[in-house]
Amino acid sequence: MLRTTASRKIVLRRGLASINTGTTVASKKASHKFRNTFWTIALSATAFYAGGIIYSQKNDKFGDFFSNNVPFAEDLLETYEHYHDRPTLFLEDSWDGLKAKSNDLLSGLTGSSQTRRSNRENIEVKKILSLEPLNIETENSDPQLKEIIGSLNDLINSLNDSNLSIPESEFNSIKKSNQNMLTNLSQLNETLKEALSNYMIQRTSEVITELNTQYENSKREFEKNLQKNLLQEVDEFKENLTKQKDKELEEKLKANEELLQAKHANEVGLLSITQVKEFNKIIKDKIEKERNGRLAHLEEINSEVNDLSKSIDRSSKILSKNEALVQLTFQVDEIKSRINNNNLPDVNIDKELSRLKLLSNLLSTFNKKSCCDDGDCCSCKKGNKNEGKEGKISCKCKPKTNPPSLLSVALDELESTCSGKKILSNEQIYNRWNLLADDFKTASLLPPNSGILGQLTAKVFSLFLFTKTGNPSNATDFDSVYARVGDNLRVSNLNDAVEEVVSLKGWPHKVCESWIEDARRKLEVQRLVEILDCEIRTL
């Protein structure tokens, strides 16, 4: 249809041209600026990248510069090196054939454009360029081939989107080239798959063969090492067993030898004992004869010597007891003088207590009674049935438990009262009572359940109170009690002062708790020291 219309236009133009109208018709020149510019840029870029890739393979410095500064140069170099280093060369040949066909196609397009430029006056039938994409199954194909097919499809889509109008002959040629390229790429894809499959089969067989060889070698080596280790272990076990049996045999021989030696020694010892007994019997008979003769008064002398030693022991005990009593009296007097000395603000009597405990324990040993009821110890009795063969007497009397003495009880109480604590003097106790004057006045104004406001109010109003001094009365108000306690402390009547303070109740009693504790400690120490002094004087 298009060809018939074009032929009619040509005939019409020729008919009109044969008519001499006196005017000349200028034929318009066919202009394809966009298409020519596109193909020029594409060919220039292809030549630039191809030359850069080729020269980069020869010069490493240029290759680094080219890949770092030119866009897409690094990806193209990696693609080229990938296909260049493959074990087979079928991809390179296929790519060269495809590139040659593309060059022919481009040259055909260029030649056709030049022909159209030379035939300015000829009018041809044109068609819009529309190429079909390359529909090739690339599911299991090479990744680089997938990229090439994708790039060609992008190029075909860009050509289709440009809506280029080309002559029918060129359109048919381009379409045929597209079909040939599709066929070649399909063949290339199949060839790649087949080559890859063959390569994998070959490589798999080589790996299996290599693994079998390694397995056989390792198996032989393992058997050899296992046999060697087993032989070595058997030799070691044999050697250890031999050593163990030799050692056991040696130990048994040594034990038998020691048993025989011990048996021989026992027999010799038994013989020696028998001989010693016979010898002792002979000696005893001779001594009895001598005793009945020249040593008849030896027993009397021995009894007199024993009586003398007993007298000396009794005298020594009496002297030691008297010395212990003297030292106890001295220590008690020392404690008395220290706790009654007003020049010392506080006194610590731990050292004196330790000496008193030591002397008390020593004195208790002297006062220890005999274990028998008659006053004599079993060891002093002669001809006792408990006397053994060697002359030792085992006392079978029941031990008597003596109750603790008053001295030890008083010392224990004194130690529990004063251990690690200081005893204040009378003057120090009086001074501390005077220091409680302000707090005592404040406490006398406080109600039973006072809060913070009550405390502050009592503190303020206590400033207006006066402390009562002088001859106290028998009244029970706080001022009279304070005055009586101060007067008793001034005359060293600590007992009455403590009774007055203890009788207080409420806040005044709570304020004086620490003072009561110190005063009671002083009174208890004084009473215990007096008890010790009386007990020592009665011993």
UniProtKB/Swiss-Prot annotation:
An example Gene Ontology biological process: cristae formation
Chain segment of the transit peptide: 1-16
Subcellular location: Mitochondrion inner membrane
Membrane-spanning parts: 37-56
Mitochondrial matrix side stretches: 17-36
Mitochondrial intermembrane-facing ranges: 57-539
GO cellular component: MICOS complex
Keywords for this protein: Coiled coil, Membrane, Mitochondrion, Mitochondrion inner membrane, Transit peptide, Transmembrane, Transmembrane helix
Membrane topology reported for the UniProt record: Single-pass membrane protein
Top-level lineage group: Eukaryota
Coiled coil, from the record: 172-267
Subunit record text: Component of the mitochondrial contact site and cristae organizing system (MICOS) complex.
Family according to the record: Belongs to the MICOS complex subunit Mic60 family.
Task of the protein: Component of the MICOS complex, a large protein complex of the mitochondrial inner membrane that plays crucial roles in the maintenance of crista junctions, inner membrane architecture, and formation of contact sites to the outer membrane. Plays a role in keeping cristae membranes connected to the inner boundary membrane. Also promotes protein import via the mitochondrial intermembrane space assembly (MIA) pathway.
Protein name according to UniProt: MICOS complex subunit MIC60
